[in-house]
């Protein structure tokens, strides 16, 4: 049976996807990057040249090693106990791989008693998400005139990306 396309259920809005890191700040495991504005994963594969006289005029290649990088941007916060620039800098200077996850957060309903600020931003492990380990290769802080200060993180993967697709 052919797939029935449904844009209301098939697509994920960008602000629903977040980066989480294991920082030790909380007891729940993964901590969301505070005030994140974007996150991305890029997966690359090296190519091995297998061209020979039998290839005629065309190059021939095979897949080689795979690698990935993760990057994210966030607004700068001076809040403590959250995954902020200071947390990212400390993790980078620790020279150790960091466990990470990218996925959707548990849906949070804003009601009369609950405000948006009460949202714990918890990784929804009942929906597809990705995990792995990476070394933080750079963190940066940017503060332009008449702008909210922001920070960025770049990580280089160590080992495989693990797709988690709960049934």
Question: Over which residues does each language-model region extend?
Answer:
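Acidic glycine-/aspartate-rich tracts in secreted/extracellular proteins
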Residues: 75-80, 160-162
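Solvent-exposed edge beta-strands and adjacent loop segments
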Residues: 2-78, 129-152
